[in-house]
Amino acid sequence: MKDLLKFLKQQNKTEEFDAIRIGLASPDMVRSWSYGEVKKPETINYRTFKPERDGLFCARIFGPVKDYECLCGKYKRLKHRGVICEKCGVEVTLTKVRRDRMGHIDLASPVAHIWFLKSLPSRIGLMLDMTLRDIERVLYFESFVVTEPGMTTLERGQLLGEEEYLDALEEHGDEFEAKMGAEAVLDLLRELDLAQLIAEMREELPTINSETKRKKITKRLKLMESFHQSGNNPEWMIMTVLPVLPPDLRPLVPLDGGRFATSDLNDLYRRVINRNNRLKRLLDLAAPDIIVRNEKRMLQEAVDALLDNGRRGRAITGSNKRPLKSLADMIKGKQGRFRQNLLGKRVDYSGRSVITVGPTLKLHQCGLPKKMALELFKPFIYGKLERRGMATTIKAAKKMVEREMPEVWDVLDEVIREHPVLLNRAPTLHRLGIQAFEPVLIEGKAIHLHPLVCAAYNADFDGDQMAVHVPLTIEAQLEARALMMSTNNILSPANGEPIIVPSQDVVLGLYYMTRDRINAKGEGAIFKDPKEAEKAYRSGNADLHAIVKVRISQSVKNENGVVEDTITVIDTTVGRAILSLILPKGMPYESINQPLGKKQISGLINECYRRLGLKDTVMFADQIMYTGFHYAMKSGVSIGIDDLVIPPVKAQIIESAEAEVTEINQQFQSGLVTAGEKYNKVIDIWSRVNENLSREMMSNLSKDTVINAQGEEVEQASFNSVFMMADSGARGSAAQIRQLAGMRGLMARPDGSIIETPITANFREGLNVLQYFISTHGARKGLADTALKTANSGYLTRRLVDVAQDLVINEDDCGTEDGLTMKPLIEGGDVVEALRERVLGRVVAEDIVIPGTNTVLVERNIMLDEKLCDLLEEHSVDEVRVRSVITCDNDFGVCANCYGRDLARGHIINAGESVGVIAAQSIGEPGTQLTMRTFHIGGAASRASAENNVQVKTNGTLKLHNAKYVLNTDGKIAIISRSTEITIIDSYGREKERYKVPYGAVLTVQDNAEVQGNDIVATWDPHSHPIVLEHKSKVSFSDIDDSNTETQTDELTGLTRIVVKDLSKANAKEPKLIIESEERGLQETRLPSFTTIEVVDGTTVNPGDVLARIPQEGSKTRDITGGLPRVADLFEARKPKEPAILAEVTGTISFGKETKGKKRLVITPDEGDHYEEMIPKWRQLNVFEGERVSKGEVIADGPESPHDILRLRGVTHVANYIVNEVQEVYRLQGVKINDKHIETIIRQMLRKCTIMHGGDTDFLAGEQIEVARVNIANRDLEAQGKIPAKFEIQLMGITKASLATESFISAASFQETTRVLTDAAVNGKSDELRGLKENVIVGRLIPAGTGFSYHQERMARRKQRNVVEEQTVSAEEATQALTDALNADLSGNQ
């Protein structure tokens, strides 16, 4: 019998498959799947509850209802397996076959498949070159279509109404054929000769000039080719046989009380069968045409509803007015098959409970309630009890566990030992949301969680719940221990910094114990070692904060990695000496010889990890936590109302501000300032007051004045509780203390605008009713925002994961020499991100040399770690070319060198790591911290935009970049280019500051001059845009008269100026200046509305002089989109509303003939055709007639469109743009994300390209294809010496990129399921199952992480299999083996 079971198991082995293909099913294929035709709409007999014969649940077709038992009960038991009962016709087999045996319905009249008809673009319509409207009229029996014109004047595919048809019949008789309904469409599709049509269209394409026609033909050609190549037949889009789903997948379940719950599909099938049978009868009876037609139409509608209810017309509803769920609804949406059952499954062996603090746990432990553990580990306990002989059977073991006998607890202890469990807190936003711990049994019902992992889980103990899962198999336990254990996840995968960081109480305790206090007990003592200091503290002879000397022996690794022991006497405090007792060997004492705030502790753990490795760090982190909790308790830091000290100058500050505001209000009433100016000024005043007040308050709080041992007055940091909490980073911030002890400040309305009356009171003084009302007004918006934000952030994460899920490290080095150039990010006078932060953990793309020499500092292909980064800083290197994911040459993944360091582990990344998902999670997880608001610029922000000079902060050399300039009459530099930047270089050649300088700015110093800090080096007028002369020229006026200009006289100086009127109102000519110079000849400059002319007609003007000034208003008051919506816009690659206009080619600017409301901009390159573009007149251009621009330069200001940047400046520029813009949003919120995560997403956005020219490939011009596929095809062609295809890389938004992925399974499970599947079926697509998602859906290990090697082995096996024939068992051999086994067994048991 054992052999028999072995044999059965062998037969049940799943096939290894490498791809899944989807296509159209031919009628023959549907019949081959089927086990019989369903002829009746009956389901089951309501008395016997047995399935009706030939009905929707028929046992003869679909299989028996009970295992190994036929319907009438003649054959029962296993011995009759395979017998077909002659009485009821049922095969004796497992009832499980009712899940996979299909039936079919022979349709009396063909029916169009609604997906290929209505899913846009309509495939049937494209095939026949008819509009959807026309085809629907034929299908739903409204008009005839000519299927065979014969010798008549009619055309094939022509539509005829009822009247026209009768007329044509009279005229031509039987010479032509016209039909209606799906039969007609079927005939038309049959007639198509694909090969011939394709050849004709390929010939016709090059001759077509009209763009729309070419697009249409290309579309049709692509569809025909995909049908031709995939072996699909167009006529299969019309169904003549309808498959019937196996009955157990659309069950009929008896409820109590004799009623039945049924799947909606049964109703839909019954409807189809009823109508089909009725149609058959009508056809047999030869009923009148109009009745038959109506019945056929109803059949078509019934099948439509079965396949996709509601796609056409009103959805068919059931008895309860709810639309029935059709086959299409089963698979799409959040509740569909993909997202509900395949990608998100429920798990057994899990429990959930509230969490509470476990301050005594070690980092790898969690407290598990006994009751919960008993339930979760039941099977293990049963097995152990039985093996021990404590229970004879499983049933007995069950009883023991239910009674909770004492032995059970001992067994539970053993079972749990070394068996990790997974803890998960929803929402799981990144991979640290699930970690493994060793359970420790505890009394009570709450799970105990180690405080240090709270940051990773984003958990707090205000009622959060967590789920526990038990890994069952030995492989799962191994992975949990080796990869998911909390001790292995010390660094955050998003930025490589420690995520196991103390917070709140622990920070406060450590901060308190490392502070120093003047005049503390025991000051000036000297201790022989930290232990003695601790003894003094314990015995009460020395205070924790006393400044003392301690002899410290430390062993620190030097440069060569040798451990040296040193003994020194160090000035420190008692508390720090005590803390040094838990400092691991090899860490320098300096690292704790300072007051430790949150930042310092984080740095301490980071340094420990880099110096000493994982094990020491974990133990140190635990010790830090215990110590921190202990001393937080000792400190007795608490908060009382007297700790909130209100600065005495508050009343005076507010009084003076109110006086200023009153003055502005008076000015407003006398009409000196506008309402807008008044609003901005008032808000400016209050913002300034708020800042001053909070500065006063903090300085008041943070310092105490004491008299030291020498009798002098000195200041020391305060021991005020509130200040200590904020200063240490434990809780609270200056902004919150300001509201408690300063003033509440300005409040926002729900629409984000600021209310101009501030709340001058603080919370200690208390608010009056009006103030309270103002503060609630904006606060409610905050709550509504949070809910919105969470949903939006979740959706962004989902889209990111979807686009990046199949990006996996799949080789060590792709060998590319390409990369990105990294420089420090400098904005104004501040280094926003230093070079070391940008290149740490990256692989060098080309040798780094010491600046100014040829000495190689770091060779290419070496990863920059902390030591090498220190080296770069020593030699003041400020530009490094590093490898990047974006430039990686790998076709279907990324190589380890282009990715660099695995941030969560600190070494170069392993093969098989799924970097795409990590990137998506790292960007999506902090999404909830971003704001949702679009900022309205006003007040302080508008003040910043009115900068009018550059004031440098440091000493150094001034350098100009991309500058075109002329020297004016004073010999100063006047800038005449757009994208000029000034940088300040220090004595080592490092860039320290970088400023943008506008057109028309005047420099006060020359290029390469030495400048001092606080020097003003450039000035300009912020309110107007000057037109500056390049050469000495004669200027004359043209079209300037009273109709379009007016003369204004300045009252103070008495000077008169000519100002252009508003040209958009009157139909005036546009005034021009004619400029005549030796260098350029005649040029004309047009003057827009409101321009002030600064010169007199007919005078000669020097270079650098200003001809005219164009006012700069209006463009500055745009809203800035910030926060989450901005990030989403960038990743969706959306075009901005009014994008900047960039120069398409390099050349000279001129203006052509104008049209109504548009200017014609012409750029003439040195050779080749000129380029023209129409630009709205109101757009302010940055260029003038005759100016040279280079390709990609900004012509009109505005937000730049990433598509333009890619097209005109290339891949690296667009990558830099998106990275910097995304980082700016996150930086504002203080979130650190490594650049390479954003680059990873950008790589996925750039994976498609448009074919410009097909070369010798099969690609059509204008086709969109994966870059990888084009590269592979081109490599093959180049090897054969043929012409490769030319292509242009496209930037795609993440949603579009996810839907355009090669894998149709992945795309279908993301969005627009119907469209994706229709498309894939028509193209006969194969899914190679490369990504993670597809493999999860088909239920395999994913090709990443530990599954990576499994898939590599599978591929290797497949290669072998192509050589060696696999051993298979034929049906005859199988039956023989079975009979032998059964006979042997029977004879043995006699």
Swiss-Prot record:
Cofactor note: Binds 1 Mg(2+) ion per subunit. Binds 2 Zn(2+) ions per subunit.
EC number, as in UniProt: 2.7.7.6
GO MF, one annotated term: magnesium ion binding
Matching Pfam families: RNA_pol_Rpb1_1, RNA_pol_Rpb1_2, RNA_pol_Rpb1_3, RNA_pol_Rpb1_4, RNA_pol_Rpb1_5
Chain positions recorded as Zn(2+) 2 binding sites: 814, 888, 895, 898
Highest taxon in the source lineage: Bacteria
Residues annotated as binding Zn(2+) 1: 70, 72, 85, 88
Keyword Transferase: yes
Keyword annotations from UniProtKB, A to Z: DNA-directed RNA polymerase, Magnesium, Metal-binding, Nucleotidyltransferase, Transcription, Transferase, Zinc
UniProt cofactor(s): Mg(2+); Zn(2+)
EC class: transferase
GO cellular component, one term: DNA-directed RNA polymerase complex
Binding site for Mg(2+): 460, 462, 464
Classification via CDD domains: RNAP_beta'_C (cd02655), RNAP_beta'_N (cd01609)
Family that this chain belongs to: Belongs to the RNA polymerase beta' chain family.
Subunit structure: The RNAP catalytic core consists of 2 alpha, 1 beta, 1 beta' and 1 omega subunit. When a sigma factor is associated with the core the holoenzyme is formed, which can initiate transcription.
Role played: DNA-dependent RNA polymerase catalyzes the transcription of DNA into RNA using the four ribonucleoside triphosphates as substrates.
Name of protein: DNA-directed RNA polymerase subunit beta'
Organism of this sequence: Pseudoalteromonas translucida (strain TAC 125)
